[in-house]
Structure formats: C-alpha cells, structure tokens
Amino acid sequence: MDVAGAGGGGAADGNIQGVPTHNGEYTQYNIFGNLFEVSRKYVPPIRPIGRGAYGIVCSAVNSETGEEVAIKKIGNAFDNRIDAKRTLREIKLLRHMDHENIVAIRDIIRPPTRENFNDVYIVYELMDTDLHQIIRSNQPLTEDHCQYFLYQLLRGLKYIHSAKVLHRDLKPSNLLLNANCDLKICDFGLARTTSETDFMTEYVVTRWYRAPELLLNCSEYTAAIDVWSVGCIFMELLNREPLFPGRDYVQQLRLITELIGSPEDHDLGFLRSDNARRYIRQLPRFARQPLDRKFPNMGPAAIDLVEHMLRFDPARRITVEEALAHPYLATLHDINDEPICHSPFEFDFEQPSFTEEHIKELIMMEAIAFNPGNVGDMMS
C-alpha cells in the first residue's frame, strides 16, 4: 500500500516496547521483524499502518507537540540511484509545497551517525485512510462525498500544476483521507517539472490510470496526463470499480477505445511517431459508448465533466482550472480559495553525475534543516 499514513491494521494496542540507543537519543522498535529506529521524541503508541515496496509506515506520537504522525521508513535507501533520487524528489517537493490538499512533511529524522546512514525516515502528518481503502470498503458514499473528494483533488492539483510540476502517479491509494473527509495528495516520488518530461519506465505508473499518450510512448506529455488520471479516479469513486483495469498495455488501450471510441486522425496530433500512428490505425475500431447509458446512476453534469477529462487527445482535455469551474462543482468552487504556488519548483539537484553518495549528502542536509541542533555530534 503506497501511502504516507493510512490508518488501521497491525498491533492495534500500539503496545510495542522500544529499546533506547545512542545514549538514549534514539529508540529502536521491532515491528513485525522490521527495526524502526527513531528520535526519542517519537513515542508509543507505535502502530504499523502500511507497507509497500519501499518498506513500512508506522504511526507514532511526537511527544514535543502531541501530534500523531506517520513515519515512513525507506530501508537501504541508497542501494539504488533511481530509488534514492525518488526519495530526494519526494522530500524536496513536499518541502516546497504548502497546501491543504497536499500531505505535509513534518520531519526527516536525522541519522544518529553519518557513516551508518542507510535508512531514511520521513515523518508526515497522519491521515486515517486512503481512497483505495474507502472504494473497496462497504462504507456508503453519497454523491456529495464524491463531489467533495473530486473538488479537493482538483484543488490540490491546481496548486501542483501552478508550481510547474506534474504528479504522474495519481491513483486512489495516493489520496489520503481523514474522518473529516479532508483529502490530501501524497507520493511525489515520480513527479516531474513540466520541462523534464522523460519517458516513464514500465514499473513506474499504475497502468489503469495512465493516459493514452503515455501508453503510446509519447515523450512530450503535459499536465493533461494528471487530468486523465483524475477522470479515472472519479469514475471509480462513483462506481466502486476501476474504469479501465487493463492487464497490459494492449488491453489498456482497448478498454479505453471501447468506452470513449477509437480516435480520429485529428485526435492524433500529439503523436510525433509514425509507428504510434500506424499502431493506432490498425487497432479494431470502436464507436463511442454513451456514458449516460452505461452509467445510468450518474447525473448529466458529472457525465459531462468526465467526458471532458477522458478525451483521447490531450490538447482537447479539460484543464484543472476549467474542471474546477465546471457546473458540476458550482456549489464548492471558489476561485479566491483555490491558491496557487507562487514559485515554480526547480529540480536543481538532477545532474546525471549525481551518485548515491551525493544524494545521501543532500538528504542528510534536509534532515539537518529539520533538526539543526548538535550537528557537530553527527559530523564527528
């Protein structure tokens, strides 16, 4: 589960005992066989609340502020340059962003010693669950819930896009929720600035939410890729099942064209590659299905908004600002309460020559920025 703090699960009483280390400055916990070593200010109840390819997420309490937080441990974070860069990206981006609908980073736990710095612990604000869990649950969702979740997702995305950043991995498990129905976007490890749209490797983005231009290897993609993902997420929210659950690339494109219709030649202007155009033209042809017939539970305004999000040609897809101003969101939209980011985010640490050691140094500096005291002890 790829979340920075979704609640539930694990040792429910949080009664995990810690062992003091490094002269009592840190405490080590054993969580399902995972060693979790955090600064002593983070105290029980410690509960495992999520795990993924990167490691494990636990909730804890910051004894200095009384706030419950989510701590993500990324084990052996510097073994692989790509993953190390992803961690640095997430930290840098979340420190740059400040928005109600984007998860806040609270701390990078400073490693006790420089030479044994292998695991990164990122501390986030704690949320209760994520949209994936809610969609899969039996919890009833009203149209008002769905509308409010969509509004907050677009509101956060407006801020992200205004910072000249594409999220690139929007999916239900990356949208955190609390009991108030507040929604926060998380997991920025795959984000890119609009000027560095390198092609994404297969393992990267979840295929089901991937826009046609990415499925077709288009290298010059835009913020419209995130809008496509939002359309897929919104439909999944309303219908409680994925819209395009493709098993592979070929089936993914087929599911898309079966629903929204095969693209016409004028929809393919974004494709620079003749091979991609030829590939599209030789696929079986499908007529567009009327969404109101296929999804009779959806009202006309919701259908209209989704149809504008799920357009094959990214240039004809609705923008986030236009979506916020759509009649479907009229009761929530307030342009004066939809802030933008005033300084574009710069990935100025992206030199190809950066080694794992360079990245380790940069993450160390981030940890020191959060915890400036006693830096000399750590350096020695």
From Swiss-Prot:
EC number(s) reported in the record: 2.7.11.24
Q: Which residues carry this modification: Phosphotyrosine?
A: Y203
Q: How is it modified after translation?
A: Dually phosphorylated on Thr-201 and Tyr-203, which activates the enzyme. Phosphorylated in response to pathogen-associated molecular pattern (PAMP) chitin and to a lot lesser extent in response to necrotrophic fungus B.cinerea spores. Not phosphorylated in response to osmotic stress.
Q: Which residues carry this modification: Phosphothreonine?
A: T201
**Amino acids binding ATP:** I49, G50, R51, G52, A53, Y54, G55, I56, V57, K72
Q: What induces it?
A: Up-regulated only marginally in response to chitosan.
- Catalytic reaction(s) noted: L-seryl-[protein] + ATP = O-phospho-L-seryl-[protein] + ADP + H(+); L-threonyl-[protein] + ATP = O-phospho-L-threonyl-[protein] + ADP + H(+)
Q: Where's the motif TXY?
A: 201-203
Where in the numbering of this chain does the Protein kinase domain appear?
Answer: 43-329
Could you tell me the Gene Ontology terms of the biological process aspect for this record?
A: innate immune response; intracellular signal transduction; pattern recognition receptor signaling pathway
Active-site residues annotated for this sequence: D169 (proton acceptor)
Q: What activates or inhibits this protein?
A: Activated by threonine and tyrosine phosphorylation. Activated in response to bacterial and fungal pathogen-associated molecular patterns (PAMPs) including chitin, chitosan and peptidyl glycans (PGNs). Activation in response to chitin requires the CERK1, MEKK1a/b, MKK1a/b/c and MPK4a/b signaling pathway. Slightly activated in response to necrotrophic fungus B.cinerea spores. Not activated in response to osmotic stress.
What does the UniProt keyword field contain? ATP-binding, Immunity, Innate immunity, Kinase, Magnesium, Nucleotide-binding, Phosphoprotein, Plant defense, Serine/threonine-protein kinase, Transferase
Q: Which cofactor does it need?
A: Mg(2+)
List the Pfam families. Answer: Pkinase (PF00069)
Instruction: Mention any one GO cellular component term assigned to this protein in its UniProt record.
Output: cytoplasm
Record GO terms (molecular function): ATP binding; MAP kinase activity; protein serine kinase activity; protein serine/threonine kinase activity
User: What family does this belong to?
Assistant: Belongs to the protein kinase superfamily. CMGC Ser/Thr protein kinase family. MAP kinase subfamily.
Its domain comment says: The TXY motif contains the threonine and tyrosine residues whose phosphorylation activates the MAP kinases.
Function of the molecule: The CERK1, MEKK1a/b, MKK1a/b/c and MPK4a/b proteins are involved in pathogen defense. The pathway induces rapid growth inhibition, cell wall depositions and accumulation of defense-related transcripts. This protein may act redundantly with MPK4a in innate immunity triggered by pathogen-associated molecular patterns (PAMPs). May also be involved in resistance to necrotrophic fungi B.cinerea.
The protein in question is named: Mitogen-activated protein kinase 4b
Q: Which gene encodes it?
A: MPK4b
